[in-house]
């Protein structure tokens, strides 16, 4: 996917430039800037439900970690959940048409809030690179552009796995697997900007694991009281796909409200493993359609990124499946939370000044 740029009109000041790299995640958004700022926040926007919640919060709109903490007092929106605005059609993402405008408003407000965390000095030009899912449509990319209008002077949209590859300098003969909350994106790197044929996107990612685990646990432990967020927290504490001796034990209220310990090891493991077949199928597709001379070299350089890359044993499980291709080597990025934002920032900073001027 070739980079696309757009300029927000109306600002002509030339008092310096702040470059920003942003990974607008379905669950969390990370941002890095040339002034040293590095932040990660929940990708959630909330509006007070009534005058009481408005008085308690003292504001008309709440973002990120604060919105997540007070979500019961708010009408909340995760503007990029299930790939909405970024990848899937709004009907695919389960967004009612009458709510789509609210999702777009939330996306715009979230981008503005995240940029404000970078504290750009007054009069500074803000240039940004933002990651989108590998197979995002032109319509989805336009929705991201619209969310950035008025906040950035110029914006470049690149695929999330490409941003990871650029940041880790993994630009040739490599396969990047970026496992987020809403999508899992695979990208084949061959020393140039990847085309659509070099990329695969799957809707089975972190949210899919959470929802499947929720249903499996509900079936296995009908006496337990829990929410999807409690399942997500349990997954993040002890998620694994391979056979280990560790147990995933949680203390949740039972039907009577008494704290009770439940063993959800089997259910969590089954849910976490459920994303693996699509990842392996995507890798097979990208490898089998690559130049035969370089297939083996590419299989020796599979890189896992994104929050889902922290699933214990995922790298070994994929390596086992790659044995039918003669084997492969799977590694994980060192900073899964910031790998996309760091790469986007590096790309923004490396672009020649003339390149940004051309799109202003």
What does each of the following model-derived ranges do?
Residues 1-15, 152-177, 341-349:
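Conserved phosphate-binding catalytic cores of ATP/NTP-utilizing and phosphoryl-transfer enzymes
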Residues 7-42, 168-196, 213, 242-246:
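Gly/Thr-rich phosphate-binding beta-strand-loop-beta motif of the actin/hexokinase/Hsp70
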Residues 29, 45, 111, 148, ...:
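Residue-level signature of catalytic and energy-coupling elements of molecular machines
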Residues 24-129, 279:
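Conserved phosphate-binding loops in N-terminal lobes of ATP-dependent enzymes
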Residues 114-126, 220-227, 283-301:
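Phosphate/pyrophosphate-binding loops at sites that engage ATP/ADP/AMP, CoA/4′-phosphopantetheine
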Residues 99-104, 108, 156, 163-167, ...:
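Helical "lid/coupling" subdomains associated with nucleotide-phosphate turnover
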Residues 102-169, 206:
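Active-site neighborhood for divalent-cation/phosphate handling
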Residues 47-63, 190-276, 301:
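Phosphate-binding glycine-rich/basic clefts of nucleotide- and phosphate-handling proteins
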């Amino acid at each position: 996917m070739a980079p696309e740029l757009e300029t927000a009109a109306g600002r002509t000041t030339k008092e310096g430039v702040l470059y920003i790299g942003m990974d607008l995640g379905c669950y969390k958004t990370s941002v890095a800037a040339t002034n040293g700022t590095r932040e990660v926040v929940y990708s959630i926007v909330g509006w007070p439900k009534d005058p009481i919640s408005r008085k308690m919060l003292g504001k008309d709109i709440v973002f990120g970690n604060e919105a997540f903490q007070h979500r019961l007092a708010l009408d909340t929106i995760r503007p990029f959940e299930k790939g909405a605005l970024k990848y899937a059609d709004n009907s695919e993402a389960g967004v009612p048409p009458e709510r789509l405008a609210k999702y777009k408003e939330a996306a715009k407000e979230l981008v503005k809030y995240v940029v404000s965390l970078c504290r750009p000095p007054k009069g500074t030009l803000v240039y940004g690179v933002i990651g989108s899912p590998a197979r995002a449509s032109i319509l989805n990319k336009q929705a991201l552009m619209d969310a950035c209008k008025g906040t950035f002077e110029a914006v470049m949209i690149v695929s999330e796995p490409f941003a990871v590859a650029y940041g880790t300098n993994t630009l040739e003969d490599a396969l990047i697997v970026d496992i987020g909350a809403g999508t899992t994106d695979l990208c084949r790197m061959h020393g140039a900007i990847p085309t659509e044929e070099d990329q695969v996107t799957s809707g089975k990612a972190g949210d899919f694991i959470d929802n499947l685990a929720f249903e499996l646990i509900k079936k296995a432990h009908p006496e337990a009281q829990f929410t999807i967020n409690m399942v997500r927290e349990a997954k993040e504490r002890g998620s694994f796909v391979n056979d280990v001796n560790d147990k995933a034990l949680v203390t949740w209220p039972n039907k009577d409200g008494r704290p009770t310990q439940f063993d959800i090891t089997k259910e969590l493991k089954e849910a976490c493993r459920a994303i693996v077949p699509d990842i392996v199928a995507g890798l097979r597709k990208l490898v089998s359609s690559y130049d035969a001379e370089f297939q083996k070299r590419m299989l020796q350089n599979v890189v896992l990124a994104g929050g889902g890359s922290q699933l214990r044993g995922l790298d070994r499980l994929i390596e086992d499946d790659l044995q039918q291709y003669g084997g492969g080597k799977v590694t994980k990025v060192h900073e899964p939370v910031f790998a996309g934002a760091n790469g986007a920032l590096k790309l923004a900073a490396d672009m020649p000044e003339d390149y940004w001027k051309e799109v202003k």
